[in-house]
Amino acid sequence: MRELCGEAVEAARTAGASYADARAVLRRQQTVATKNGRVDALSDIESEGIGVRVLVDGAWGFACDRRLTADGAHDAAARAAAFARASGGGGTRELAPVEPRRATYETSVEIDPFSVPIAEKIDFCLRAEEGLRRAEVKVAEAFVRALREQKVLVTSDGAELEQELVECGGGIDATAVGDGLAQIRSYPSAHGGSSAQAGWEYVLSLGLEREAPRVAEQAAALLQAPECAPGVMDVVIDAEQMQLQVHESVGHPTELDRVLGSEAAYAGTSFLKPVDVGSLRYGSPLMNITADPTTPRGLGTFGFDDEGIPAEPQPIVREGVLVGWIGSREAGFPGSMRADGWSRMPLVRMTNLHLDPGEGSLEELIEGVDDGLYLETNKSWSIDDKRLNFQFGTQVAWEIRDGKLGKLVRDATYTGITPQFWGSLDAVAGLDAWRLQGLTNCGKGQPGQSAHVSHGAAPARFRGVQVGVHA
């Protein structure tokens, strides 16, 4: 594939491109899901192709071809150059410099997930799902997934890079129904479980079968729990919900293409402006956010992004102040360009975006609350197209009274304005409570692309938060 990409780059240069890159990608994705004792979904999909991106007279062009042949490479290069020329740039476009290099990168895997037979995966899901079954649980689900992506990137700057990334993950859901209510509990995370850049050993480490009875019990208990009452109070938010909070209210608004107004699909633009970096107060001094594509097991981990930039940690917020962007070579903040396979051009995407750990334990955070809520596991989210005004719902919550957990509460929500909310942060638990979760459904772009990203966070405490809004 390296020679094929090289041919595509040369063909693009011959067609008038001042810059060109070519990515050849082989991808295999497998999903197994069971529901109420039966196989609910089973897929094993393979795809391959080449994508060519070019600059001609300051305008971008992109084309792809499913043929991993010389004809496919040359045709994609010619079409990409023609598309760029038709865009009528009429100028130049500067890209941040990158050192030419030849290198390889691959995920560390103990058990190849594609070596595990389908029948074994089905049995694994059925056994995990069996622990969810009780009278109140009307829908019991378990699922596992795996992905392998092999890709080669060659650029006219002299980069020749090969990577093999492997992902694996899974989860369980229990939906309890009764008295006109339906309540869901998930593990280890909502909306598709959790995945990591690892092998089948990661799925085994999740303990789905072990956790299933607890998940089902909580789903059933929620049917008898009172609804979260409205009010303003202190909240302690668990690591999993904090990860989505980071994703929606920090990750998307700090994507530099949104800030510059060149991207608005799916998640809107941003309340931030280019001049805000280095001065804008994003949150309290306890807020530290880092983008780190070197995180072990992170779904956003790589050796090089899809522009050939080597992976390295990048500070985004330090002591509550905005200090960096998620960006690209063109925008002057390189290192975060990724494409969803061979048929899409790279976009500015989150890698692994973390809330850095603080000090202390979850129990100590709760002890510091006289009257409040402990919120756990995302259920719903809504945020405006500037990433300012948001509301999140969690699957489960507990009242906090005099520093101790009290009764269970259902349908809990909390609402805020991004900078004010982060400004109310007054504690983040330490490294022992810090958890990494991977999600596979971050949508962006037109045509649409889905990015796989991970977020790390520990439980955090916020003062004076509006809760219990149901609208």
What annotation goes with each model-predicted range?
Residues M1-E312, R318-V321, K404, T440-G445, ...:
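Active-site bordering "gate/hinge" segments
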